[in-house]
Amino acid sequence: MEHQLLCCEVETIRRAYPDANLLNDRVLRAMLKAEETCAPSVSYFKCVQKEVLPSMRKIVATWMLEVCEEQKCEEEVFPLAMNYLDRFLSLEPVKKSRLQLLGATCMFVASKMKETIPLTAEKLCIYTDNSIRPEELLQMELLLVNKLKWNLAAMTPHDFIEHFLSKMPEAEENKQIIRKHAQTFVALCATDVKFISNPPSMVAAGSVVAAVQGLNLRSPNNFLSYYRLTRFLSRVIKCDPDCLRACQEQIEALLESSLRQAQQNMDPKAAEEEEEEEEEVDLACTPTDVRDVDI
């Protein structure tokens, strides 16, 4: 009789059950201490970089976010990749023509850290219109991890969101909505250089407050009121409530600016003007200068 093996594997990714021990105060205190060790320099554009500008970082960050969204990466991948990028730029001068290679490499490493099935080098090269080769990406990977001293388990705002939600006496339905909106705010903050100066815990807390404010959620015990929630989260992360409010206001201003920019991009007149400009300037199909990247 022919023996056959029965394969019981499924395509869905297996996930661990939530562990309450990982959400206790001792773990949160350790995370608040650890976030200081993986913070990038807030002045690397002035002190380290000679060619790369904040506007170039914005372009590459937006491209990285779109790649992560299209590939349905885990929510943690993009903020972690941006942490790698900012820390590398804090240490090493980078030519503007190599910034997209660095961004792809950061996604490559972050995907390995956070995903069961990580992004491949070949797939990331395709997203650059094959302007880089897999061999270049692997070489940059070695340089990246060495410059970061293999300290790759950096804290990101996503790591704190679950801790905050676990301490909020709210219904699970509300928590799911808040979590989704807060994750969107975290990704948006990662694209803006102004938030480098804020620790991940503050970005996470500000995102949760902004999510609750934007959703206009109400609770029977009034826990979700603006001032009460702000005071509560400021005590959790041990910061001044005014600093947390300032961060939350920055997040809301960034959202408003992004929505305004999206509306302008959808304006037919603006699109026609952009097409006329593209006709006047003959650009290469694969931009070698990051400022020429058309997101």
Swiss-Prot record:
SUPFAM superfamilies: Cyclin-like. Coiled coil: none annotated. Keywords: Cell cycle, Cell division, Chromosomal rearrangement, Cyclin, Cytoplasm, DNA damage, Isopeptide bond, Membrane, Nucleus, Phosphoprotein, Proto-oncogene, Repressor, Transcription, Transcription regulation, Ubl conjugation. One of its GO terms (biological process) is negative regulation of transcription by RNA polymerase II. GO terms for cellular component: bicellular tight junction; cyclin D1-CDK4 complex; cyclin D1-CDK6 complex; cyclin-dependent protein kinase holoenzyme complex; cytoplasm; cytosol; microtubule organizing center; nuclear membrane. Residues 272-282 have a biased composition (Acidic residues). CDD domains: CYCLIN_CCND1_rpt1, CYCLIN_CCND1_rpt2. Residues 262-295 are annotated as: Disordered. It comes from the Eukaryota. The modification Phosphothreonine is found at residue 286. There is a cross-link at residue 269 (Glycyl lysine isopeptide (Lys-Gly) (interchain with G-Cter in ubiquitin)). Residues 28-152 form the Cyclin N-terminal domain. It is found in: Nucleus; Cytoplasm; Nucleus membrane. Phosphorylation at Thr-286 by MAP kinases is required for ubiquitination and degradation by the DCX(AMBRA1) complex. It also plays an essential role for recognition by the FBXO31 component of SCF (SKP1-cullin-F-box) protein ligase complex following DNA damage. GO terms for molecular function: cyclin-dependent protein serine/threonine kinase activator activity; cyclin-dependent protein serine/threonine kinase regulator activity; enzyme binding; histone deacetylase binding; proline-rich region binding; protein kinase activity; protein kinase binding; protein serine/threonine kinase activator activity. Interacts with either CDK4 or CDK6 protein kinase to form a serine/threonine kinase holoenzyme complex. The cyclin subunit imparts substrate specificity to the complex. Component of the ternary complex CCND1/CDK4/CDKN1B required for nuclear translocation and modulation of CDK4-mediated kinase activity. Interacts directly with CDKN1B. Can form similar complexes with either CDKN1A or CDKN2A. Interacts with UHRF2; the interaction ubiquitinates CCND1 and appears to occur independently of phosphorylation. Interacts with USP2. It is linked to A chromosomal aberration involving CCND1 may be a cause of B-lymphocytic malignancy, particularly mantle-cell lymphoma (MCL). Translocation t(11;14)(q13;q32) with immunoglobulin gene regions. Activation of CCND1 may be oncogenic by directly altering progression through the cell cycle. PANTHER family: CYCLINS (PTHR10177). Belongs to the cyclin family. Cyclin D subfamily. Regulatory component of the cyclin D1-CDK4 (DC) complex that phosphorylates and inhibits members of the retinoblastoma (RB) protein family including RB1 and regulates the cell-cycle during G(1)/S transition. Phosphorylation of RB1 allows dissociation of the transcription factor E2F from the RB/E2F complex and the subsequent transcription of E2F target genes which are responsible for the progression through the G(1) phase. Hypophosphorylates RB1 in early G(1) phase. Cyclin D-CDK4 complexes are major integrators of various mitogenenic and antimitogenic signals. This is G1/S-specific cyclin-D1. The gene is CCND1.
